[in-house]
A protein has these predicted regions:
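Von Willebrand factor type A / integrin I
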Residues: 1-36, 46, 172-178, 188-190, ...
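Conserved phosphate-coordination/catalytic loops
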Residues: 102, 157-164, 255-258
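An amphipathic, basic-hydrophobic helix/alpha-beta surface used to engage anionic
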Residues: 1-135, 139, 179-182, 189, ...
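Von Willebrand factor
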Residues: 144-178, 190, 212
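Short amphipathic alpha-helical interaction patches enriched in hydrophobic/aromatic residues
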Residues: 93, 152-156, 272-275
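Short, electropositive alpha-helical surface patch
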Residues: 137-150, 293
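Short, solvent-exposed coil/turn elements at secondary-structure transition points
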Residues: 53, 130, 158, 212-214, ...
């Protein structure tokens, strides 16, 4: 499942962007995210009067010559953001639609690249059934990132996924130190809201990305059809349906899809999370440089 997006030209265009975290970070130093505290970087922030125990190397002697008082220079604190990308690997995300699978992997890779390019750390957490697989661990640096991507392009999309069970059972979600992204189509009867509640409880900034194929947004079926649940693949599954596609049924489907999107958006807004729904025929660059910039996720 090689993606046409994942090439040097694509990644070079991403180098002009950065992920934006709206909250202060706790955690590791060494990234490019400024927080409202003083630290060890070289970017000047302010002055204050010298106090016993301060580093005398920070005394500004020019100010001393003017005011005959000791002032020390304060510098901004930069910290490293922890970016966690939860990727729904259920069958509906790509078993029968390799283009949708490649798009999902490309979006995950783009967000991961932005993380390591800005000296942050990233992990790809694959949601399979009710568990999370973390095949690469924490990734820091582009060499490790590109090795992970070469493997990520070949992951298997199959069976079902329980987003809430997987995320809430994940042992390394961190706390108050970064961004959690959930990439899924959310075409499931299983609960997904507990996952968002759990991550916001952990004081994570949350981005929910819904990916839908054009056929899922506007199905081209007509006449009599036999719909088989892709996540079970079982022709005897009670969720399968025999339908006669009529105009009224098409309109009912589109209304149900609008209701689903509205429900996700409303819930995310109530929890302080961001929600973006994207059709997979939309160029990824337009989504990154358009939707995510507009939402303030990137800068």
């Amino acid at each position: 499942m090689k993606s046409a997006y994942l090439n040097d030209e694509f990644f070079s265009r991403l180098e002009t962007l950065a992920l934006n975290l709206r909250a202060d970070l706790s955690g590791y130093f060494g990234g490019k995210h400024f927080v409202r505290s003083y630290g060890q970087t070289v970017e000047f922030a302010d002055y204050r009067e010298y106090q016993l125990g301060d580093d005398i190397r920070r005394i500004d002697w020019n100010l001393y010559s003017r005011f005959e008082k000791y002032f020390i220079r304060l510098f901004t604190d930069e910290r490293q953001m922890d970016v966690q990308i939860f990727l729904d690997c259920s069958a509906s995300m790509g078993k029968e639609n390799r283009g949708k699978a490649a798009y999902a992997v490309s979006v995950a890779a783009a967000l991961g690249f932005l993380s390591v390019h800005n000296m942050d750390k990233v992990s790809f957490k694959l949601i399979k059934e009710g568990a999370v697989e973390d095949p690469f661990g924490t990734i820091i640096g582009k060499n490790t990132f590109f090795r992970a991507i070469s493997i990520l392009e070949n992951i298997d999309f199959s069976e079902d996924a329980d987003i809430s069970e997987a995320v809430t059972s994940c042992v390394n979600t961190g706390s108050n130190n970064g961004l959690s992204v959930i990439i899924s189509d959310f075409l499931t009867r299983k609960d997904w809201k507990k996952a968002i509640d759990y991550l916001t409880y952990k004081k994570r900034q949350v981005l929910v990305l819904q990916l839908l194929s054009p056929d899922e947004v506007d199905p081209a079926y007509s006449g009599r059809v036999n719909l088989i649940d892709v996540e079970s693949g079982d022709i005897g599954d009670p969720r399968n349906m025999k339908l006669k596609i009529t105009r009224s049924l098409q309109l009912a489907y589109q209304e149900a899809l609008r209701d689903l999107k509205a429900d996700i958006k409303s819930f995310c807004t109530s929890r302080g999370a961001d929600f973006i729904s994207v059709t997979t025929d939309k160029p990824i660059e337009r989504m990154l440089f358009g939707e995510l910039l507009k939402a303030g996720i990137m800068e």
